Each structure stands twice: as structure tokens, then as C-alpha cells.
Amino acid sequence: MLEVTLPGEGTPPAEGFRTLHSLKRDLERYFRGYPVDFDDVPVRINVSGKPREVLELVREIPYGTVVTYGDIAQKANTHPRVVGVSLARNRVPIIVACHRVVAADGLGGFRWGLEWKRRLLELEGALPSRR
């Protein structure tokens, strides 16, 4: 459904190395708590319709920001459950930052477990207060 697209056939080896090196460096910085924008990482979204629209909208959520499933659903003109199902299929969760989508009354779900979602949001300084 999703994959990070790295340089392939016909790409000069040095360019591919720079891409991998850059992604590795950005991930290291991210996990050290530095704001990192992954917008320039090429991602192939191999779905269509609402799931694709949802994932594209989630890619636009800035570092340190959270939005609700309902917010994304409203923008995509769909149901919040469609948003949740679409995000559960995300295979590149730091690049397509589905952890930044939360429930109106708490964290909501996360394919890799709520503890990881909580850690990622804490890292970004975006953990919602308990209601």
C-alpha cells in the first residue's frame, strides 16, 4: 500500500547513497527530538480513492501538531472510521505521520501500539492533554 521510493535502476549510485544517507540522518535527528520535515521523501501510495486522499492529507500535518480523525474525515468528506482503517495500513509511520491523528477524546488507535504513539507525540511535544 505504501512504500518509500528510493532511487532505482538508472539512478547514479552516488545519488542513491545521498538519498539513503539523508533519510538515515533525518531519522536519527527525529528520534533525538529535532523537528524534521519528511516532505521531500518520495512515498508511493499504492491505493486509490478515500484511503489515498486520507494518507495524502496526513502527510501535510506538520511536526508537533495533532489533528483528529474527524478533522481528516471532514477534509476528505468521509467517515472517521475510514480514516482509522486507512491509517492502520500505513507502513511508513514516521514519514506518513499517522501518529499525529488522534481521537477527539484521547489518543485513538495505532497499529504499532499506543505506547509508541504516545512516545512519538511526546518526542514532538504534541501529546494531547487527558480529557
Curated annotation (Swiss-Prot):
The UniProt record lists the keyword Transferase: yes
Reactions it catalyzes: a 6-O-methyl-2'-deoxyguanosine in DNA + L-cysteinyl-[protein] = S-methyl-L-cysteinyl-[protein] + a 2'-deoxyguanosine in DNA; a 4-O-methyl-thymidine in DNA + L-cysteinyl-[protein] = a thymidine in DNA + S-methyl-L-cysteinyl-[protein]
BP GO terms, sorted: DNA repair; methylation
Keywords of this entry: Cytoplasm, DNA damage, DNA repair, Methyltransferase, Transferase
Localization (cell): Cytoplasm
Top enzyme category: transferase
Enzyme nomenclature, EC number: 2.1.1.63
One GO CC term on file: cytoplasm
GO molecular function, a single term: methylated-DNA-[protein]-cysteine S-methyltransferase activity
Similarity comment: family membership: Belongs to the MGMT family.
Role: Involved in the cellular defense against the biological effects of O6-methylguanine (O6-MeG) and O4-methylthymine (O4-MeT) in DNA. Repairs the methylated nucleobase in DNA by stoichiometrically transferring the methyl group to a cysteine residue in the enzyme. This is a suicide reaction: the enzyme is irreversibly inactivated.
Note: This enzyme catalyzes only one turnover and therefore is not strictly catalytic. According to one definition, an enzyme is a biocatalyst that acts repeatedly and over many reaction cycles.
The protein's name in its UniProt record: Methylated-DNA--protein-cysteine methyltransferase
Species whose genome carries this gene: Methanopyrus kandleri (strain AV19 / DSM 6324 / JCM 9639 / NBRC 100938)
Source lineage: Archaea, Methanobacteriati, Methanobacteriota, Methanomada group, Methanopyri
